[in-house]
C-alpha cells in the first residue's frame, strides 16, 4: 500500500477516535444504555459494533475472524475500541499488506461504517437530552499517531450553532 494511502487511512482512524471521544465526552452516566426505541442499538452496543466492524477490517491484515463478546460497561467497550484502532493503525504504519481488499475498499466499507456509528453516538446524545457541543472539525487537532481515548479539546467550538435544546 502506498505511503500516501496508508497515511490517509491512519488519519481517518485518528479522526474516528476524535469524533467518537467528542460524542462520548461528558456524556451523562446513564447514556451507555440509552434506548432511543425501534430496536436501535444503545451507545454501548454501538461501540461494541464499531469494534466488531474494525475487527473485521483487521482480518484483511491478519486473517481469521473477529466477533467480540459484549462487555458489561461502556468504558470497557470504549477501551477495546481504542485498542482496535491502535492495532489497525500499527498495521497501516508498518505497511502490512492487505489481503483481498484495497485501501479504497477498506475506507468505503468498514472504516466508513465505523464513522457512521460515531455520528450515531452524537445523534443519540441529542436524543438523550445531552447534545454534543458543535465545533468546526476542519481545524480539529487530529494527529494520525493518536487513536487513543485521550483526544484534544475542540480548537474551534462553533459559537453560532445552538448547543441547547429548544
Locations of regions flagged by a protein language model:
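N-terminal export signals and maturation junctions of secreted/periplasmic proteins
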Residues: 1-5
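Helix-adjacent hinge/juxtasegments
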Residues: 59-97
Amino acid at each position: 500500500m502506498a505511503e500516501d494511502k496508508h497515511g490517509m487511512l491512519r488519519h481517518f482512524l485518528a479522526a474516528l477516535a476524535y469524533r467518537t471521544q467528542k460524542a462520548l465526552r461528558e456524556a451523562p452516566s446513564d447514556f451507555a444504555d440509552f434506548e432511543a426505541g425501534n430496536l436501535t442499538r444503545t451507545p454501548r452496543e454501538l461501540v461494541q459494533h464499531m469494534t466488531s466492524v474494525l475487527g473485521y477490517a483487521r482480518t484483511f491484515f491478519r486473517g481469521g475472524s473477529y466477533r467480540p463478546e459484549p462487555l458489561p460497561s461502556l468504558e470497557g467497550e470504549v477501551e477495546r475500541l481504542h485498542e482496535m484502532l491502535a492495532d489497525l493503525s500499527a498495521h497501516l504504519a508498518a505497511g502490512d499488506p492487505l489481503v483481498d481488499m484495497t485501501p479504497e475498499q477498506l475506507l468505503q466499507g468498514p472504516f466508513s461504517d465505523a464513522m457512521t456509528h460515531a455520528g450515531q453516538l452524537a445523534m443519540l446524545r441529542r436524543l438523550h437530552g445531552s447534545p454534543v457541543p458543535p465545533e468546526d472539525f476542519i481545524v480539529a487537532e487530529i494527529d494520525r499517531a493518536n487513536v487513543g481515548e485521550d483526544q484534544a479539546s475542540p480548537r474551534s467550538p462553533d459559537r453560532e450553532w445552538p448547543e441547547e435544546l429548544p
